[in-house]
Amino acid sequence: FEAETDVTNQKDLMTACSGHVHYSVQGTAPRTDLDFRHALTAIKFAVGQNLSINKTISKVEIRNALSKGKYTLSDKFDGTGAKWENLSDAKTFKLEGLAVSTNQNPNAVLTGNDGDNYTFYMIPQELTGKNITVYVEFTDGSKIESTLKGSWLAGTTKTYKLSEKNSTWEYTLETTNPASV
């Protein structure tokens, strides 16, 4: 399997295993159940606690992630034993030409919403110590870049929350004298 580097062209990889099929009655097709599973990791991005408002995201990239691998199907109905191996070919995965506003509440998903075709479908892999980074660019020329840690597991969704050290949030506190009782 090879993941597309243009996120809008990526496809999810679904697999299904029937387990052992028993042909016990001659002339009668055996029953075969299939339980489908996602073999990739879905990646989304959301508003973090300190992301500047009034900005527009123009580009999101995942850099240095492995793009190729061999997927071995399970021979069990529950999918145990399926695995990824021989991962190779570090590439940059790009989502360009965006106009996604940051004027949303914390935790609001920015990419990967139903119908937007902005979900990154990545091969499951170890991230810690592999120099895999996320790069986000805004129309004003500012950017966020961060090194990823942990791992991506098959059949899961990872949502990364975007925050900045210094945001454009302005806080105003107004006080009033307490009323006498």
PLM region descriptions:
Residues F1-T56, P106-G112, K158-L162, W169-V181:
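Short, low-hydrophobicity acidic/polar segments
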